[in-house]
């Protein structure tokens, strides 16, 4: 994947402003609410019976933070995302058996959360760079499925 200097700058500069705790918990919560079939991968998280329960669930928040923190690795390794996610791809494919389409859904949720948090700073050019990044990450996570 080729990244222009502008794309790299847009991604990295926005990432420095991201509150990983807040955005991560919100992103995973939204995924579980908007796409309820994804909840089956998180049955050990306890109460996921309503949007209120999901948004208040400390395990959802903690795992969301973990997911967003992992996403930060992509930001740091834009030129080597496939290798960065090799072990996570293997885990999600061979052990967790996650439908790889869910990675695209989570990527879409990431975009929504970033847009909600950054408003006018999340310009169309910034969105395009981030959209590219979430697609590259989703593809890297799905790599072991092929």
From Swiss-Prot:
One Pfam assignment: Globin
BP GO terms, sorted: hydrogen peroxide catabolic process
Alphabetically ordered keywords of this record: Heme, Iron, Metal-binding, Oxygen transport, Transport
PROSITE patterns, per database record: GLOBIN
Origin superkingdom: Eukaryota
Entry-linked CDD domains: Hb-beta-like
Keyword field contains Kinase: no
Family matches, as InterPro entries: Globin, Globin-like_sf, Globin/Proto, Hemoglobin_b, Hemoglobin_oxygen_transport
GO cellular component: blood microparticle; haptoglobin-hemoglobin complex; hemoglobin complex
GO terms of molecular function: haptoglobin binding; heme binding; metal ion binding; organic acid binding; oxygen binding; oxygen carrier activity; peroxidase activity
Positions bound to heme b: 63, 92
Domain spans labelled Globin: 2-146
PANTHER family on file: HEMOGLOBIN FAMILY MEMBER, HEMOGLOBIN SUBUNIT EPSILON
Family statement drawn from the similarity comment of this UniProt entry: Belongs to the globin family.
Function: Involved in oxygen transport from the lung to the various peripheral tissues.
More about this protein: Sphenodon Hbs have properties not found in other reptiles: poor cooperativity, high affinity for oxygen, small Bohr and haldane effects, appreciable phosphate effects (those properties are also found in the Hbs of primitive urodele and caecilian amphibians).
Quaternary organization: There are three forms of hemoglobin in Sphenodon: A, A' and D. Hb A is a tetramer of two alpha-A and two beta-1, Hb A' is a tetramer of two alpha-a and two beta-2, Hb D is a tetramer of two alpha-D and two beta-2.
Name by which UniProt lists this protein: Hemoglobin subunit beta-2
Gene (UniProt): HBB2
């Amino acid at each position: 994947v080729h990244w222009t200097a502008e794309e790299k700058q847009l991604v990295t500069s926005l990432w420095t402003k991201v509150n990983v705790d807040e955005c991560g918990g919100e992103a995973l919560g939204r995924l579980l609410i908007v796409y309820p079939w994804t909840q089956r991968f998180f049955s050990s998280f306890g109460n996921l019976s309503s949007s209120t329960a999901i948004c208040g669930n400390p395990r959802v928040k903690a795992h969301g933070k973990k997911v967003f923190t992992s996403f930060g690795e992509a930001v740091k390794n834009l030129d080597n995302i496939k290798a960065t996610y090799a072990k996570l791809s293997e885990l999600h494919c061979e052990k967790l058996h996650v439908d790889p389409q869910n990675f695209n859904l989570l990527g879409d949720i990431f975009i929504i959360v970033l847009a909600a948090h950054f408003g006018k700073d999340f310009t169309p050019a910034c969105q395009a760079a981030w959209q590219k990044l979430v697609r590259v990450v989703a593809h890297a996570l799905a790599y072991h499925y092929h």
